[in-house]
Amino acid sequence: MDVVLTLAGNLVPLYALIVLGYIAGKFFNVDRQTLGALGIYIIMPIVTFGYVAQMEFRPSYIALPVVFYAMITCVCFIWLAAGKKVYGDSRANLMAISSASGNTGYFGLPLALMLLPEEWVGVYIFANLGALLFEATILYYLAARGRFSVRESLIKLARFPTIYAVAAGVAYNLSGTGMADVVVTYWEYFKGSYVVIGMMIIGAALAKVKRMVWAPRFISLTFAGKFFMLPLISVGLIMLDQSALHLFDAQVHKIMFILTIVPIGANIAAFAVEMDLKPEKAASTILYSTVFALISIPFSLYLYENFIAITP
């Protein structure tokens, strides 16, 4: 229990930044879209490039985004089928995308910075490409109930600058050219600012929730997919690799686990508003999942480190 409390204590500063973002959005009218644009189009690509350019790249890492994409797609369609039986309306779509979509960027990257050696954060970012691809394809399609074609979804994906930052980082990495000290110094500034801006964006987004909705059955089913089934699939694949495949080492296993234990993605609220997909229920569920993660993440990591992880 002491270990769980210690891990929870380490998360408190991140949640303090969320609270600051909430205050800024609620009382000072800070625009989350402006913060989001700053994070997505300027800070995140620079941070991403730096990490990927400096990581020790291995060909086997190419499989990571594919594996993660397959995992979350599997959960999404299982929960979509279950949602159609329970609800039979658009709530099934919302439950499916909420169960599969995690806040792997704004929340997950600061968490990775806290839990991983710095040289492995680039691998986390590379693996997270699977989440970006899922968002631009399956998530868009289900959120819009078929409104976007595959071509339109891919065009939306092509507009996401992090894709190009990863590609540029891989190319620079393979060139064997090291980053100059002065570049690394300023890149460190961007890395710190991303943690602050990213967590505050979550708070600013939650500040715009006009009415909280408490739907116990919907929340329970969504949480079962997000906080139980998805990590369970991850653990199954990790144990398969540990016992038979031996493709990845312990840090990669931990990265795949971290990707599955973060709260529901904040972008779900934006999709719900745009598509008229019960936006208040979506925003409320995101808030509940973010609060719940303060307990679930330390507990999940404790179980992982003590019963699943193999010390290298």
Model-derived features: where do they sit?
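Alpha-helical transmembrane segments of multi-pass small-molecule/ion transporters
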Residues: 1-312
